[in-house]
Structures are given as structure tokens and as C-alpha cells.
């Protein structure tokens, strides 16, 4: 069973069994929080945009003074740690990546799997960044930006299958 306490779950958002969503958390319409993920807004607000997905085993948390905002259509890969940061629309944060307090990741970005985005790092719109610490590598191609959107849409569809 999922655990939801004091969260604002909007429209057709979905929280999987075993996931935990607590505190000052808003899940936008069509967003999803997958198995064993934790979204914990006990110290500062967390907003997950419409159609975004928080995949299995991920932790999203916010510290006092560092709220967390995830844009629309964004994918947070399995076992990522998202902590007190801002992530734009249609961005993919790869599996196992860590994004720290005060980091700002733009829209239409990819953060490579296993990357560490350190506190206060800024990744501009449309960029690929990876490494530990993560560095901007190059602009995304239009095909990569489209794939980000396709990924988000596929998770919206999978969410609807899981709910049935």
C-alpha cells in the first residue's frame, strides 16, 4: 500500500504501492510516483509538475530554504536523489543521479545516469550534463529533446495501465 499524508494529489496523478508521499507536496495532474519512491515535503515544499514521473526507488526531499520544484513532463530516473533544487520542463534526470540543494537544471535537459549535480550548479536550458561533479557537455539535439517528451508520455501511459 502507498502512504500519502497531507499531500495535494491533483487530477489523474498516481502514487504506486510502496511509495511514500508526505508533507507539503503537490503532484500535478497526470504525474506519477513509482514503487518505493519517497517524496518528502516535511521541511520545505515540493512541487511535481503535470505529467512528470518520479521513478522507482527515487528520493525527493527539500531542506528549509531549499524548496524543490520539478517542471511538467520531466522524468526522474530510478534511484535518483533530488534534493532542494529546481528542474525545468521536459528534462530527464538519469538513473542514480544526485541533484543537490540550490541546483537549477533548465528545461529540455538531460542529466546523465550516476551524475552528481553539486549545490548551486546551474545547467542552462537544452543542455546535456554528466559526471561527478556534473559538467555541461553540449547542447541537446532536437531528436534528444523529442525523446525527453516521448519518455514522459510513455510513463503517463504506463501509469494508466498500472492503475487498472
State what each model feature region is:
Residues 6, 11-47, 61-65:
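N-terminal first-folded block
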Amino acid at each position: 500500500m502507498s502512504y500519502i499524508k497531507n499531500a495535494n494529489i491533483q487530477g489523474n496523478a498516481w502514487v504506486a504501492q510502496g511509495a511514500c508521499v508526505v508533507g507539503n507536496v503537490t503532484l500535478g495532474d497526470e504525474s506519477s510516483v513509482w514503487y518505493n519512491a519517497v517524496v518528502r515535503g516535511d521541511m520545505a515544499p515540493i512541487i511535481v509538475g503535470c505529467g512528470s514521473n518520479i521513478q522507482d526507488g527515487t528520493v525527493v526531499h527539500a531542506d528549509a530554504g531549499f524548496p524543490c520544484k520539478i517542471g511538467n513532463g520531466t522524468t526522474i530516473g530510478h534511484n535518483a536523489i533530488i534534493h532542494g533544487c529546481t528542474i525545468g520542463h521536459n528534462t530527464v534526470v538519469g538513473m542514480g543521479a544526485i541533484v543537490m540543494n540550490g541546483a537549477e537544471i533548465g528545461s529540455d535537459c538531460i542529466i546523465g545516469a550516476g551524475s552528481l549535480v553539486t549545490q548551486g550548479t546551474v545547467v542552462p536550458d537544452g543542455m546535456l550534463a554528466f559526471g561527478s561533479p556534473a559538467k555541461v557537455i553540449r547542447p541537446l539535439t532536437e531528436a534528444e529533446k523529442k525523446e525527453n517528451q516521448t519518455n514522459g508520455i510513455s510513463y503517463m501511459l504506463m501509469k494508466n495501465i498500472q492503475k487498472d
